[in-house]
Amino acid sequence: MNSAALNARTASVAPQPQACHACKCRQLLSRRVPPAQRQVECSAIAPETLQDIIVGGAVVGAVSVALYAGLKKDPVPCSLCQGTGGIRCFACGGDGRNATVSRDDLYDSKALGGGVAPPKRDPLGRTINPRDCKVCRGAGLVLCSQCKGTGFQSAF
């Protein structure tokens, strides 16, 4: 082949458009698609643009939260418990212990064998201490139902 024929052959072939990234436009640019349909603009978001959108959204969100937190008022004590977080347990008197515990309550009566019987356990396998007050669970304090023991009213 001479160079004139080679130049004429390459001049008649249009340059192939390049796909921007891995999306559907890559399939449309294949040789199987007729040239009239190959002229397509990709509407997909480039990865760099997507990253800019995510970072920008995170910055705007962080600034919004900081501004909102700065606009909050001073905490107000709970109106129900007057800021104490709860009341002293009425069942144990704030002690957290149950004074009336029998020997049968301490150990499982179904255990066989001599010696000391194993302690009672709840369904999750945790040891139950029968000396703890059942109302306050050994804390000596019943938490306020309005503030959940924080002593302050909800600011939100």
UniProtKB/Swiss-Prot annotation:
Record carries keyword Transmembrane:
no
- Please tell me where Zn(2+) 1 binds in this chain: 78, 81, 144, 147
Q: Which GO terms describe its cellular component?
A: chloroplast stroma; protein folding chaperone complex
State the UniProt keywords alphabetically. Answer: Chaperone, Chloroplast, Metal-binding, Plastid, Repeat, Transit peptide, Zinc
How changing residue 81 to S affects the protein?
Impaired chaperone properties
Which GO MF terms are attached to this record?
A: metal ion binding; protein folding chaperone
Effect caused by changing residue 92 to S? Impaired chaperone properties
Q: How does it assemble?
A: Interacts with the RuBisCo large subunit (RbcL) assembled as an intermediate complex made of eight RbcL and eight BSD2 subunits.
> Where exactly is the transit peptide annotated in this entry?
1-41
This protein's name? Protein BUNDLE SHEATH DEFECTIVE 2, chloroplastic
**What are its GO biological-process terms?**
chaperone-mediated protein folding; ribulose bisphosphate carboxylase complex assembly
Cystine crosslinks: none
Q: Where in or outside the cell is it found?
A: Plastid, Chloroplast stroma
Q: Which residues bind Zn(2+) 2?
A: 89, 92, 133, 136
- What does the function comment of this entry state? Chloroplast chaperone required for RuBisCo biogenesis and translational regulation of the RuBisCo large subunit (RbcL). Stabilizes an end-state assembly intermediate of eight RbcL subunits until the small subunits (RBCSs) become available to produce a complete stable RuBisCo complex containing eight small and eight large subunits.
Q: What is the lineage of its organism?
A: Eukaryota, Viridiplantae, Chlorophyta, core chlorophytes, Chlorophyceae
Species name: Chlamydomonas reinhardtii (Chlamydomonas smithii)
- Stated consequence of mutating residue 89 to S: Impaired chaperone properties
Source gene? BSD2
The entry's family comment says: Belongs to the BSD2 chaperone family.
